[in-house]
Amino acid sequence: MTTETRSLYSQLPAIDRLLRDSSFLSLRDTYGHTRVVELLRQMLDEAREVIRDSQTLPAWCENWAQEVDARLTKEAQSALRPVINLTGTVLHTNLGRALQAEAAVEAVAQAMRSPVTLEYDLDDAGRGHRDRALAQLLCRITGAEDACIVNNNAAAVLLMLAATASGKEVVVSRGELVEIGGAFRIPDVMRQAGCTLHEVGTTNRTHANDYRQAVNENTALLMKVHTSNYSIQGFTKAIDEAELVALGKELDVPVVTDLGSGSLVDLSQYGLPKEPMPQELIAAGVSLVSFSGDKLLGGPQAGIIVGKKEMIARLQSHPLKRALRADKMTLAALEATLRLYLHPEALSEKLPTLRLLTRSAEVIQIQAQRLQAPLAAHYGAEFAVQVMPCLSQIGSGSLPVDRLPSAALTFTPHDGRGSHLESLAARWRELPVPMIGRIYDGRLWLDLRCLEDEQRFLEMLLK
């Protein structure tokens, strides 16, 4: 060991001496004596490695307290951090899908702070059913006889098939054998549920007679799957639920539908593309309809099944139901969200998902123009900051081919180097409230469709 190396090692402080420093008092109060000591030991080991490998001290050795504070602050951050979604995808699966209405947030907070009547009947002073209140709401909204709630729509499909078709065949059109994110495939779910898939028709065309010829003594269900995350166009033919229900009645086979995204209102009244609604399928005679709570419905992650009382009873009594049931926070948020649908005239203001989807391109354009000047002044030395038209998407497999006119702030490096865009995007991801945009066509795009808090936006970007 050289004299210089020995000198560097000798400059490393003792932990006891560091802890006596006044700058460590608040750190010990905030993070605890044990964790601070543990980190200091780790940092001393790191410093010794740096000395051994590069014959120098780490830069942070000049201020140990500052480095400890920085590391512990980062460590204390929640893994689920709030971000500003400027990707242009409203229901972004990776960013948590639907924002919750204030009423839902308050309901969840109350359910977390206090005992609640989750499975307690106040009238009878006895055990109740956790789905009962929501089932009544869902029946009122959809016209169904009964309802069942589980933790997501994949679980809803699994339960629906396991409880009604295990050991039997389920007839599905080849054009509806969907795969959604995470490699969730209808054929795989059927195998897990103990069903046998009976494919009929072709990818682009399926006729009523295809279903008719497939039905045999072992057929349990005729199933429709809404292809919410892709579209087949051109020379196509599909059987709608009303026609399939008529066939099912003739053959004494019930019809079920996996609706996927599941809107409870006619979106066309807001100028958006129309999606099939559970109440339409219930009116058509479908026995069971499953859909998601956190997509177009705008609530928490949940799987909702509505339909005929006798079939819902089979779902409720199946062993899987307990494994898949929703917890009190989910039920509280979902109930509060569903109650908003009882007052449709205020829905587009009180339901964040609908509010964001219905923002006009003109309003977003004005917002972008208002924000462009301060950002250009701050970033103009390196980037051209412009207002550009763009197209938002709904996301989460909803209305996959439809786009919503929007406006974005774009950042283009003056030197044309893509690495500068990557660096800027990385800097924004490191902000106290990370900013998530997208890089496309030599620009960094910030689609403002989902931006409602302009003050926080500017506070972050002008740091």
UniProtKB/Swiss-Prot annotation:
Domain of life from the UniProt record: Bacteria
The protein's enzyme class: transferase
Reactions catalysed according to its record: L-seryl-tRNA(Sec) + selenophosphate + H(+) = L-selenocysteinyl-tRNA(Sec) + phosphate
Alphabetized Pfam families for the sequence: Se-cys_synth_N, SelA
Cofactors: pyridoxal 5'-phosphate
Sites of N6-(pyridoxal phosphate)lysine modification: K295
Oligomeric and partner information: Homodecamer; pentamer of dimers. Binds only one seryl-tRNA(Sec) per dimer.
Function statement: Converts seryl-tRNA(Sec) to selenocysteinyl-tRNA(Sec) required for selenoprotein biosynthesis.
PANTHER family according to UniProt: L-SERYL-TRNA(SEC) SELENIUM TRANSFERASE
Name of protein: L-seryl-tRNA(Sec) selenium transferase
Origin organism lineage: Bacteria, Pseudomonadati, Pseudomonadota, Gammaproteobacteria, Enterobacterales
Gene: selA
